[in-house]
Amino acid sequence: FNLDNNSKPLRDYLNQIMEHMEDYPISDMIRTHWVTVEGDWNWKCVQDNFNESYHTPYVHPGLKYVAEEKYQACQFDMYESMHSRLLMPGFMPSVSVYEEEDKVLELIGPHIEYWDMKPDDYKGRLLDIRGDLQKQKRKLDKEKGYDFSKFKDTQLTDHYHYTIFPNMSFSVKPDGMQWLRGSPHPTDPTKCIFDYWYLT
């Protein structure tokens, strides 16, 4: 729905993002979790944070155990449409926690156990988890109710995070996605209304 009769079609506005999303089964997903909060920050700060990975060590300190969240390991794409994409390697712990193997396996464990992988098999082999999980997801996708045939290996494990100008972000995987939206507070510019949705 758009109040501007002269606006360009949504597909044209989203441009590359629309092309990237074509293989994801979004229309088959349902919203399973959602929350709306009022925050003590301006909505533009929220969007700026989701557009980079500098904030992850402070806002998401546990992420380093399950993803290589350092900005040097991530790919950032800015499009002429003012939208952007962040690619972050998942199921590959950050270099900073290689010595914390037990903690890494504790946090990655439930995710890989779902795909019939044993965390203890990866003692001394943390960097093998990502590739093995990609193979295992391909092997078991139909059995688990998925079809990953249209996706690249990295799409099965890594964080593909998009920011749509001006105030929407989402992370997507073939088996689920989360939507994040920061909106201006109706009366206080130092506050924000923040919506979070998870679809699977």
Mark where each language-model region is:
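C-terminal catalytic domain of Rieske-type non-heme iron oxygenases
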Residues: 1-200
